[in-house]
């Protein structure tokens, strides 16, 4: 009984000491809540969006890579390339490369000039594709897919940056098109025009979709680009690189034998338009963890200084408590209890806010910063904002020509 009576005064001192220095503890509490909440939200948002990126590879039929030929390939050349076999001359040794069979898909486009403000001046380059249900599908973010030769769907991120909206009329190489919808292509998570670009440009570069008739209205030369999917999916990045090297040798040999030329070759792993966003989120997640560690060390230092000052100010009271029979361990636990309580409460509140509020903030930042749309962020946005929005998003994609969710 006597032991309990001795402990009670220390326990009663805790709320009094917190109230006495409430401004100091409030600042530390808010700092911890914001730090833990933001980092927690970043982890939740990044994990959900990276998961959506992985699922989007199959759902939206993302390419394993693409190459461009000088001239359109005939059916015989397409079949030869799909075989994955190296074409060798009769007097040459067989290649050491493994046979890498693939499936090829036409993914032709035209690079046209874009005038989105109807001032008669070139505002940028717009890469125009036709609607397809086979490879590199697009997700409808707003509006509808083009239904006739006068309609066009443009990239959501580009539209947001230049103030373009559904229903606007733009000029593509002098031809007028009505913006029917805003889309997000699975192979353009960011708007990199070239694979050598260090940074994407969502203002001067745009990707768009038109009907076949709309494509025929345009005049610029066609880029004969073929996307491929491996018959046997690589298990990891290392195998993907090996398959890509083997396929490159086979493809080039077949193209040269047919008298054609290879203009470009871009496997998926080296395509910044596909990988930049996920790489960026992965680095942000790691940076968030390091930032949290640094801030926790800073907070620990602040608490150490605070406790030291408190002990110095209450040295006489501590002497009285020691004379009353309190051990050093009991006094240490008492003066540590206030920082521990503040840190624990801040961690609880911070994680609650991280899972409910800050994850939406982080998703919104990526949504604005990069062309994530629903094609990439659909699952991430749904995980971060609830199943109700996911159902609404699925409803818009299910009737699309290019999203083709109904076919998946």
Question: For each predicted feature, which ranges?
Answer:
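Membrane transport/envelope proteins' first extracytoplasmic loop
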Residues: 2-300, 309, 328-329, 364, ...
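A short glycine-centered flexible hinge/capping loop motif at secondary-structure junctions
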Residues: 325-326, 346, 350, 389
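Short, intrinsically disordered low-complexity segments enriched in Ser/Thr with adjacent Pro
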Residues: 380-389
């Amino acid at each position: 009984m006597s032991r309990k009576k001795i402990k009670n005064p220390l326990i009663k001192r805790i709320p009094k000491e917190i109230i006495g220095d409430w401004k100091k503890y409030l600042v530390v509490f808010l700092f911890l809540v914001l730090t833990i909440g933001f980092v927690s939200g970043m982890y939740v948002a990044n994990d959900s969006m990276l998961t959506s990126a992985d699922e989007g590879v199959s759902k939206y039929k993302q390419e394993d890579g693409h190459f461009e030929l000088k001239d359109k390939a005939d059916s015989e050349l397409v079949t030869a390339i799909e075989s994955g076999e190296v074409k060798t001359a009769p007097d040459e040794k067989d290649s050491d490369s493994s046979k890498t069979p693939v499936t090829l898909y036409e993914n032709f486009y035209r690079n046209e000039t874009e005038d989105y403000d109807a001032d008669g001046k070139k505002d940028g380059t717009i890469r125009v594709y036709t609607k397809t249900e086979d490879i590199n599908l697009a997700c409808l973010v707003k509006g509808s897919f083009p239904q006739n030769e006068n309609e066009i769907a443009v990239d959501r991120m580009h539209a947001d940056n230049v103030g373009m909206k559904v229903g606007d009329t733009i000029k593509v190489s002098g031809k007028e098109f009505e913006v029917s919808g805003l889309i997000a292509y699975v192979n353009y998570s960011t708007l990199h025009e070239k694979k050598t670009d260090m940074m994407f440009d969502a203002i001067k570069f745009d990707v768009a979709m038109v009907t076949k008739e709309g494509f025929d209205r345009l005049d610029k030369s066609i880029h004969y680009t073929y996307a491929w999917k491996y018959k046997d999916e690589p298990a990891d990045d290392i195998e993907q690189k090996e398959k890509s090297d083997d396929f490159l040798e086979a493809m080039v040999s077949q193209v040269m034998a047919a008298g054609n030329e290879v203009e470009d070759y871009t496997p998926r792993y080296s395509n910044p338009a596909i990988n930049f966003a996920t790489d960026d989120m992965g680095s942000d997640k790691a940076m968030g963890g390091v930032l949290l560690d640094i801030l926790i060390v800073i907070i620990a230092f602040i608490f150490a200084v605070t406790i030291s000052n408190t002990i110095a100010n209450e040295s006489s009271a501590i002497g009285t408590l020691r004379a009353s029979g309190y051990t050093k361990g009991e006094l240490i636990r008492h003066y540590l209890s206030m920082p521990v309580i503040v840190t624990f409460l801040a961690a609880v509140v911070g994680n609650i806010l991280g899972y409910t509020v800050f994850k939406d903030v982080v998703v919104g930042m990526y949504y604005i910063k990069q062309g994530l749309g629903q094609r990439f962020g659909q699952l991430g946005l749904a995980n971060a904002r609830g199943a109700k929005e996911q159902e609404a998003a699925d409803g818009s994609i299910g009737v699309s020509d290019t999203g083709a969710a109904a076919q998946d």
